[in-house]
Amino acid sequence: MGNKPTISVSHLGCEKNRIDSEHMLGILAQQGYSIDANEELADYVIVNTCSFIQEAREESVRTLVELAEANKKIIISGCMAQHFQEQLLEELPEAVALVGTGDYQKIAEVIQRVETGERVTEVSQNPTFVADEMTPRYRTTNEAVAYLRVAEGCDYRCAFCIIPHLRGNQRSRSIESIVTEAQQLADQGVQEIILISQITTNYGLDLYGEPKLAELLRALGKVDIPWIRIHYAYPTGLTPKVIDAIRDTPNILPYLDLPLQHSHPAILKAMNRPWQGQVNDNIIERLKQSIPNAILRTTFIVGFPGETEEHFEHLINFVQRHEFDHVGVFTFSPEEETPAYQMPNQVPSEIAQARRNYLMEIQQPIAAKKNQKCVGQTVEVLIEQENPTTQEYIGRSIRFAPEVDGVVYVEGEGQLNSIIPVKITDADVYDLYGKVI
C-alpha cells in the first residue's frame, strides 16, 4: 500500500465536474493511494477538464501546459478528454492517460495500467455510467455543503451546446438512491445540499417514464438536512405539482436557478430551446404568485447568431419587468460541433460584449434593491469561513448559492459550518452585512 503513487487532482469547470473529481478521489483513497492537494508533491496529476465553451478550454489548456512544463505525469479526464480524445495525447507527450466523462470510475485501473508503462485511452464513445451512493466519494467542498447529482447527461439538443455530445443522454438515479446519499451526507454533518443535473426538472423522465422531481423533493423532505437547493430548473418543468412540493416541503429552499438564456421567441426558437418567450412570462408570474418569497436566479446568452437590437431590447425589458434576484450574462461562444456555429448573421464579439456589459448594468440596481430589502431583517446564515484578522465570519443566507451569488459578512460569535440567526445591517449590489443575534 505504501508503494502506491501519490495523486493530486486539478478540478476545472462546473459542479458536475467537481462531483466526478470527488468520486475519483474517493475511489483512489479507498484503494490506498495517497492524495495530496499540492500538485508539486504528487506523482500523477489528474486534470479534470472543462470543454463547454472556448474560454473554459483555454483555462484547461493553460493548466495542462503549466503541468507539462513542470514535467508532471498528467492524466486528462473530463469533458476535454471526451471531446478531443487522441488529439490531446498527440499534442501533449506528458499526458499518460485519457479518461472520458463516462469512465472516471475506472481511474484506479487506469493508473495501474499506466504504472506498467502503457499509455491509456479509456473513453466510452457514448457515456452511460452514472455514479450512485455506493461510489466512493471524497468531498472537496467545505464540510457544511455538498452537491448531489440526481441525473447525468441531457436529452435536449440546444443549438449552441455540446453537453449531450460530451456527457451522453439523460440517466436518472432512483429516488431511493438519491435519498440514501442525502442521508449519508446528513450523517457527515452537511447542512446544505444542492441538487444538480443538466435539467433537474426533467429528473426521472428516462427512468420512470415521467418527470419525478416533485416526488423526489417530498422524499428529501424527510432527510435531516436544513437546506436543499435546486439548480438547473427548466421553466417548462416547473409544473403546479413541483411548485407545490417546493412550497410544502420545509427544507426545500424557495430558490430556483432558471437557465432561461433569452426572452425573445425568435432567438429561443433559433437556440432550439424547449419553450417560447411568452411561456417565460407566464411561468415566472405563476412562480411569484405560488411562492411569494421565491428567490430567482437566471442566465442569459447575448450575441447569439441573428440577435438584433430589437431582440436585445426585448431581453432588457424582460429583465426589468421580472426583476430577478441574480442574473448571469454570457456572450455566445461558437462551438464547432453545434448548429449555431454555422448559422448566418453571426454577431461581432465586440457587440456581444457591449450587450453583456449593458445588461449587467441594468441588473445591478435591481440586485441592489433586492438586497436592500433584507436590511433590518433577521435571517438564517450558514457560516462557512472565518477571517482570523478581523474575527469576522463569512457565510450565506438562503438568498445566495455557493460560488455564483453573494455572501453575508457577519460580526459576532459564531460557529463554522452551523446555521445561525443574523440581523442584516447593510447591503450592497452583491453582498449583505450583519451581526449575530
Curated annotation (Swiss-Prot):
- Pfam families, per the entry: Radical_SAM, TRAM_2, UPF0004
Primary location: cytoplasm
Q: Which residues form the TRAM domain?
A: 372-437
| Disulfide pattern | none
Q: Which residues form the MTTase N-terminal domain?
A: 5-116
SMART domains reported for this sequence: Elp3
- Cofactor(s) the protein requires to work: [4Fe-4S] cluster
Q: Name one GO cellular component term.
A: cytosol
Leading EC class: transferase
Q: EC number(s) for this protein?
A: 2.8.4.4
Where does the Radical SAM core domain lie? Answer: 140-369
UniProt xrefs under SUPFAM superfamilies: Radical SAM enzymes
| Catalyzed reaction equations | L-aspartate(89)-[ribosomal protein uS12]-hydrogen + (sulfur carrier)-SH + AH2 + 2 S-adenosyl-L-methionine = 3-methylsulfanyl-L-aspartate(89)-[ribosomal protein uS12]-hydrogen + (sulfur carrier)-H + 5'-deoxyadenosine + L-methionine + A + S-adenosyl-L-homocysteine + 2 H(+)
Residues binding [4Fe-4S] cluster 1: 14, 50, 79
Superkingdom to which the source organism belongs: Bacteria
According to its UniProt entry, one GO biological process term is: tRNA modification
Which keywords accompany this UniProt record? 4Fe-4S, Cytoplasm, Iron, Iron-sulfur, Metal-binding, S-adenosyl-L-methionine, Transferase
Subcellular location per the Swiss-Prot or TrEMBL entry: Cytoplasm
Q: How is the cofactor bound?
A: Binds 2 [4Fe-4S] clusters. One cluster is coordinated with 3 cysteines and an exchangeable S-adenosyl-L-methionine.
What family does the Swiss-Prot or TrEMBL record give for this protein?
Answer: Belongs to the methylthiotransferase family. RimO subfamily.
Q: Function, please?
A: Catalyzes the methylthiolation of an aspartic acid residue of ribosomal protein uS12.
Which protein, by its recorded name, is this? Ribosomal protein uS12 methylthiotransferase RimO
User: Which organism is this entry from?
Assistant: Crocosphaera subtropica (strain ATCC 51142 / BH68)
